[in-house]
Amino acid sequence: MSNSIVIQTSSTVIEDMKQQYKQALSPKIPQGGIFMAKVPSCTITAYKSGKVMFQGGRAEAEASRWQTVSQTPKSTVKKSVNSHQYAPPSSIGTMSILGSDEVGTGDYFGPMTVVAVYVDAKQIPLLKELGVKDSKNLNDAQIAEIAKQLLHVVPYSSLVLHNEKYNELFDKGNNQGKLKALLHNKAITNLLAKIAPTKPEGILIDQFTQPDTYYKYLAKQKQVQRENVYFATKGESVHLAVAAASILARYSFVKQFDELSKKAGMQLPKGAGKQVDIAAAKLIQKVGKERLPEFVKVHFANTEKAFRLLKK
């Protein structure tokens, strides 16, 4: 008999959940629903009323990932994602800023990488000269070329959460949003210690969730950075520190990804599309399902799809 658990939460958390489960979203949405997602042994259905239902063998485990966050009081005023007290000042683009960004969260294969970079205001013209901009607009060769120069120009802190550890932490009830928050905070803390006694005029985090949710994720951490911290979506266009962090995070991710392909003995594809399902099925045949957590983010829907391909 399958379990069924219902939690009441805010629209902000439901949006965060939809983002976290984006690889597992179902085209079927029940009446009054916002989304339905299917992950291994659990179906998640979120409703406009704020209720979220978890059904299946892993209902309790999946619901527990969201229960502390779900205690956030519901906002009576609908706000835009960038409408909060942590919005950066309009002059931030010319300030000395510590910026952080992450890469690899939407890729089934490969780790999650987070990098924090400090850019002194005097270095902004140099970074522009080097071609620093959003890494999504650069190919891997351009990323490598710019990153190799950046490594000698800006102070940085780079963290890699490898797949085995990622899956272990996820199974302990840490959703992807929380893992990102922990890594951003750690990278920022590491870099502040590295550049001391220099203090940035501000810290800009490329926003992946509402700031209040970010700080809830960090509730049990001893060191949490709160002073002059700003959040903005598309942070790489707000300050070059985030753009530089994005480039170094991508550079690190690509290097780790190449190593993982060597370990797998086959070229692993990026992303989470159909070609990834096929590659995952081949990898399971090659190394066995027991070793899959060394290469992938197991909770992605691709895992179930790969096993379905093997049954055909």
Swiss-Prot record:
Question: Record's family?
Answer: Belongs to the RNase HII family. RnhC subfamily.
Function noted in UniProt: Endonuclease that specifically degrades the RNA of RNA-DNA hybrids.
What PANTHER family does its record include? RIBONUCLEASE (PTHR10954:SF23), RIBONUCLEASE H2 SUBUNIT A (PTHR10954)
Please identify the protein, giving its name as recorded.
Ribonuclease HIII
Q: Which reaction does it catalyse?
A: Endonucleolytic cleavage to 5'-phosphomonoester
The record's section on NCBIfam families has:
rnhC
> Where is this protein found?
Cytoplasm
Q: Which gene encodes it?
A: rnhC
Q: Which domain of life is it from?
A: Bacteria
Top-level class of the enzyme under EC nomenclature:
hydrolase
| Annotated GO CC locations | cytoplasm; ribonuclease H2 complex
The UniProt note on the cofactor reads as follows: Manganese or magnesium. Binds 1 divalent metal ion per monomer in the absence of substrate. May bind a second metal ion after substrate binding.
Q: What is the lineage of its organism?
A: Bacteria, Bacillati, Bacillota, Bacilli, Bacillales
CDD domains in the record: RNase_HII_bacteria_HIII_like (cd06590), RNAse_HIII_N (cd14796)
Record-annotated RNase H type-2 domain positions: 95-312
User: Which GO molecular-function terms appear in the entry?
Assistant: magnesium ion binding; RNA binding; RNA-DNA hybrid ribonuclease activity
Q: Which UniProt keywords apply?
A: Cytoplasm, Endonuclease, Hydrolase, Magnesium, Metal-binding, Nuclease
Cofactor requirement: Mn(2+); Mg(2+)
Which Gene3D superfamilies would you find in this protein's record?
Ribonuclease H-like superfamily/Ribonuclease H, TATA-Binding Protein
